[in-house]
Regions:
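Flavin-dependent oxidoreductase catalytic cores
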Residues: 1-327
């Protein structure tokens, strides 16, 4: 069973190919942006549930009014709580990453990327590197840069028209992401995993982004998309469009690729791996409905299935998830 095969990422062995992707529960984040017991309980359930890689939900590198519903890594106050997360994830032999991000400027209702002062632009950049170092201090095996779903790094890559070296042509727009990868590696060491979640509705730029991540020293490609921007998927492709994007990246890179998108059964995940479309599968809603999805799937058991609500109720507020309520 390919799902149960180990995989090495930057020298770290992941015990199987199942990933719990970063998923925020906006009903549990406290105003202080710090880890609380509800987070510990949730991530312990995922790790105990058998996934090889657990990626902690998006954490902001700076505290801003627009990301008040996220965990925050702005200062060292975050380290004790984040250490509690790594402890419970590692307790069950899972690899622990944390997704770090800054909210997109369109969400922040501030100026466009090209209107940010150079001082602020470089301050944001430094905040990512500092956050990565705090995550390493807390015991994480690595970080994931969130460069998808309209977040700040995604906006820079896709829309920056700055007049300096970070805007205009693709080579300039990708520069910030590439420099972040290089600087985080320099700061945290070559064995610290740097993953990137990214996507692009432009086929050529999707592949060029993957190549730039690899060239900069990135270790893992987590392909996703959202905000209504998707690649055109050929008729007859049997899986989600995000998996199609991952398959294109997989065919053009040497780095391991994670795919995500409507993977609800072990048979689906196994088929994706056997067809060579990705190296790992991320199971989001399935893990929300049953945190033991990985363990049960690998044991040949049937997990409690996600009910596939049109709008994910767990995402809105976890206590409202009908699958959780039905237990």
């Amino acid at each position: 069973m390919m799902l149960n095969e180990p995989l090495r990422i930057c020298g770290t062995e992941v015990k199987n190919r199942i990933v719990v992707p970063p998923m925020s529960d906006f009903g549990t984040v406290a105003p202080d942006g710090l880890v609380h017991q509800s987070h510990i309980d949730r991530y312990e359930a995922y790790a105990k549930g058998g996934a090889g890689l657990v990626i902690v939900e998006a954490c902001s590198v700076l505290r801003m009014p627009e990301n008040r519903d996220t965990l925050c890594l702005e200062n060292d106050d975050c380290i004790p709580g984040m250490k509690r997360l790594t402890d419970v994830i590692h307790r069950y032999s899972a690899v622990a990453l944390v997704q770090i991000m800054l909210t997109g400027l369109s969400t922040m209702k501030e100026n466009r990327i090209d209107e940010i002062t150079r001082t602020d632009f470089l301050r944001y950049k430094d905040a990512f590197v500092s956050a990565a170092l705090r995550c390493q201090t807390a015991g994480f095996d690595g970080i994931e840069l969130h460069a998808a779903h309209g977040m700040y790094l995604d906006e820079v890559i896709e829309t920056s028209e700055r007049k300096d070296e970070y805007g205009g042509c693709f080579e300039n727009r990708i520069r910030l992401l590439a420099e972040l990868i290089t600087e985080i590696k320099k700061t945290c060491g070559k064995d610290f995993i740097v993953a990137v979640r990214f996507g692009n509705p432009n086929y050529e730029e999707l592949l060029k982004t993957a190549g730039a991540i690899q060239a900069a020293g990135g270790d893992l490609l987590d392909v996703s998309s959202g905000m209504g921007r998707y690649l055109d998927v050929p008729s007859g492709f049997p899986y989600d469009g995000k998996i199609y994007a991952a398959s294109l990246v997989k065919a053009h890179t040497k780095l391991p690729v994670v795919c995500v998108g409507n993977i609800f059964t072990g048979d689906e995940g196994e088929a994706i791996l056997k067809e060579g479309l990705a190296d790992m599968i991320a199971v989001g809603r399935g893990s929300l409905a049953d945190p033991a999805w990985a363990r049960k799937t690998l044991a040949g058991e049937t997990p409690n299935p996600c009910l596939r609500c049109k709008i994910c109720m767990w995402y809105i507020y976890g206590a409202l998830c009908p699958r959780r309520l039905s237990k």
